[in-house]
């Protein structure tokens, strides 16, 4: 007599083995616009060439390189979704996610610092602050 497992498995037709895409497991690249792909590529180039070597040094010396945060601002990574009139890049949340993904590939600590600055500091000022507060604080934080 066949076991339950044997009966269930005999009813399943053999299929071709599924291929897993280790580079893009969620098929994200195919869903992005050309502009989003270019932004992601630019963020990747910065993170791999400029951020990674310095993060390794910061880890070795147990320091936090504050200059990296300034460079995040110069590249529009800080407050990326904040409108340009307040010093942000005026990007979409998808764009912000793509930037965060590239920073995260290098280091969670710097991605967290970027996210805290953008989401917990800048966004509340933009969303709930007065016009005077927005113009006073946001450009300096970006």
Residue positions per predicted region:
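Glycine-rich flavin
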Residues: 38, 45, 50-142
